[in-house]
Amino acid sequence: MQKIMHISVLLSPVLWGLIFGVSSNSIQIGGLFPRGADQEYSAFRVGMVQFSTSEFRLTPHIDNLEVANSFAVTNAFCSQFSRGVYAIFGFYDKKSVNTITSFCGTLHVSFITPSFPTDGTHPFVIQMRPDLKGALLSLIEYYQWDKFAYLYDSDRGLSTLQAVLDSAAEKKWQVTAINVGNINNDKKDEMYRSLFQDLELKKERRVILDCERDKVNDIVDQVITIGKHVKGYHYIIANLGFTDGDLLKIQFGGANVSGFQIVDYDDSLVSKFIERWSTLEEKEYPGAHTTTIKYTSALTYDAVQVMTEAFRNLRKQRIEISRRGNAGDCLANPAVPWGQGVEIERALKQVQVEGLSGNIKFDQNGKRINYTINIMELKTNGPRKIGYWSEVDKMVVTLTELPSGNDTSGLENKTVVVTTILESPYVMMKKNHEMLEGNERYEGYCVDLAAEIAKHCGFKYKLTIVGDGKYGARDADTKIWNGMVGELVYGKADIAIAPLTITLVREEVIDFSKPFMSLGISIMIKKPQKSKPGVFSFLDPLAYEIWMCIVFAYIGVSVVLFLVSRFSPYEWHTEEFEDGRETQSSESTNEFGIFNSLWFSLGAFMQQGCDISPRSLSGRIVGGVWWFFTLIIISSYTANLAAFLTVERMVSPIESAEDLSKQTEIAYGTLDSGSTKEFFRRSKIAVFDKMWTYMRSAEPSVFVRTTAEGVARVRKSKGKYAYLLESTMNEYIEQRKPCDTMKVGGNLDSKGYGIATPKGSSLRNAVNLAVLKLNEQGLLDKLKNKWWYDKGECGSGGGDSKEKTSALSLSNVAGVFYILVGGLGLAMLVALIEFCYKSRAEAKRMKVAKNAQNINPSSSQNSQNFATYKEGYNVYGIESVKI
């Protein structure tokens, strides 16, 4: 059993004499306050002081308890009754209402309460809170809702819900009723989010919140978290304290929010009370010292006034009221009711006064009648009264605005505010913009597009640059949209014409037209330095595999030619002199030895030829196919040689997103607020998820505030930073001086830029049709060519593309010179070796001949002559070419 904290406030006779006068008449008043109702208790105390009288004094006995605990309520009520109270003020909920009403009816003790009104007849219960059913049904009909969700707190009873369901059955409304009163506090945030996500799947964007302030605030927090507080959503807060909640956090979301207000702050009586209320000390009166008051606190203050007025009327009627001898046990069996309790009930029901909650009057059942409830709507400048509801007049609208909040006035009569962003080449300041005014200060793709859209739709427009320079993203903590999206969501602009990417999260809060430009995320890097050709770059036209095959083919052809020449009888012939006479020797010769075969193949490959040619058919077949082979190879080589020698190629260290993700030397990042960052954050693809993990944890941060900052970082990083941005912007910057950036790889995704309007805007259809028409006319492509390529500064091939051809430098052909010098050197070396070899051989021969002469002197002369002739023949004759 939970222990009840019992607080009895008994003011001393001296103090009460100072407050209420010198009269000793004391009227005991009970009070049952729930824990945490500090402001209500402060209002109760202020009322005790405010409505004091010299005729009698009210003496309160206060109990703070859990009103949901029926046992605690029973003990407190019986304790109050045994003290001899004349009436009890207090609160109840659905668990304790039957206990309290039963005691009141049995013991004839009047109970004045600001809690929710009950159905049926409950004697001795005076209900300070007006019934909201009639006003709520009238507001639903005013908004012409026929399909909505109804979220209710079962702790407040089900009477209002039952009335709505009865009307729904009669008028064929589609109502989704959901009880949020039993949601576990530990998981409430998650459950609220899940609830509204389920409603979104059902396209339920009209919601009634039949809850008290604290629960409404909890629900609104989660509505903001999941982005359901924007245009296109409408909420009705079904309690009497529209201004009691924290409306500031949802005020600029764009959603329509309506409700009811029982305390009219424009009323003079309320204004005077607030002046005094705001001067009270917070420590002495918790919840005071503010310029507002909760409607339950206002009803508490009014209840004190009603009790005071009732007892004053009894005094005027000279009806003596006393509890002497009547303070008994409330649990006695049989129960003994208080005999004079009926007189007090009658006096309370007959009270008619003006209070903080307006006109206070009761019917025979103790329920409020002849009251007025203000109808409120939340505007961007705060809560605003749009009308009121009363039992006689029903709903009366005093503010002539359409309930939907959409502007349907003619476009031709309105200057449309167009928000955009300074981003080349979409929107740029003209060089002489300081001398111009209005839209004339700007130029660019989107400036021309805005003019065309306005011409097709027939409206005047004003270009404004977004204040924070952002495209639009929702803050993870505050859930507030920034950038151009925020200006649309919060009603600061009518349309956004800019390079704004169409994404799911943005589509949830704003409307997009058909894409006016298709694009994707691409990689920008600093253009690498052109690679200089190598010493042997003349070998590049053919792959190394081909060169190896040519070498083997050369050797193979030479060997085959040698073998064919040896086996073919037609390749052998006798030697002839220059005058045509044959030698007297019968020996046949063959010119295609192995070295001559190699020389013949080399000469044919170099297209130079040699002095010998095959005589046999087989040898000529070998030579023919070799000539054909060399013809094709040399022609192909020559065709590619010019391109390889004159074009300086750029070697990029990065070719794709995979290359970026696999290395850490080159940093990479995106715009800090935009769709590109969202793409990586939400992507489930392994490569992109790996890139996002790196980007969000990189130090220093790889994110940049603007595209210009990202481009500057690429240019200054010396190839150590890559910037991820839309391909269209990448292509544009590549065409701008100093022409030192380039796009690498393909696009990472496919998306489009669209023109954005607020949810439900009347501009949406007109703008959409205009975009389609411009696309069919080819004007969109014409605008892109104008601002991307016609005004480009680097040409199609970069900054040096103006030169048609590049002159060959020494480095292009250095290898050829090296081979020439090497060949000459090799020839001289071989010649030296041959000379040395021949000299040594000649020395040996001369030595042998001299020795022979010494042995046979008689024949030395003839032998010498013959040797001299033979040597001359070997050196200069035909044999000099024989192997």
Swiss-Prot record:
Any one GO CC term of this protein is:
external side of plasma membrane
Mutation: D302G; reported impact is: In NEDLIB; severe decrease of ionotropic glutamate receptor activity
Q: Which residues carry this modification: Phosphotyrosine?
A: Y876
Cell compartment(s), UniProt: Cell membrane; Postsynaptic cell membrane; Postsynaptic density membrane
* Residues at which L-glutamate binds: P499, T501, R506, S675, T676, E726
Which Pfam families does UniProt cross-reference here? Answer: ANF_receptor (PF01094), Lig_chan (PF00060), Lig_chan-Glu_bd (PF10613)
Membrane topology reported for the UniProt record:
Multi-pass membrane protein
Signal sequence annotation: 1-24
**List of glycosylated residues:** N256, N370, N406, N413
Recorded consequence of changing T646N: In NEDLIB; reduced ionotropic glutamate receptor activity and
Which top-level group of life is the source organism from?
Eukaryota
The reactions it catalyses are: Ca(2+)(in) = Ca(2+)(out); Na(+)(in) = Na(+)(out)
Named from the GO MF annotations, one term is:
amyloid-beta binding
Functional note: Ionotropic glutamate receptor that functions as a ligand-gated cation channel, gated by L-glutamate and glutamatergic agonists such as alpha-amino-3-hydroxy-5-methyl-4-isoxazolepropionic acid (AMPA), quisqualic acid, and kainic acid. L-glutamate acts as an excitatory neurotransmitter at many synapses in the central nervous system and plays an important role in fast excitatory synaptic transmission.
Family membership noted in the UniProt record? Belongs to the glutamate-gated ion channel (TC 1.A.10.1) family. GRIA2 subfamily.
Record's disease association: Neurodevelopmental disorder with language impairment and behavioral abnormalities: A neurodevelopmental disorder characterized by global developmental delay, impaired intellectual development, poor or absent speech, and behavioral abnormalities, such as autism spectrum disorder, repetitive behaviors, and hyperactivity. Some patients develop seizures and manifest developmental regression.
Q: What is this protein's record name? A: Glutamate receptor 2
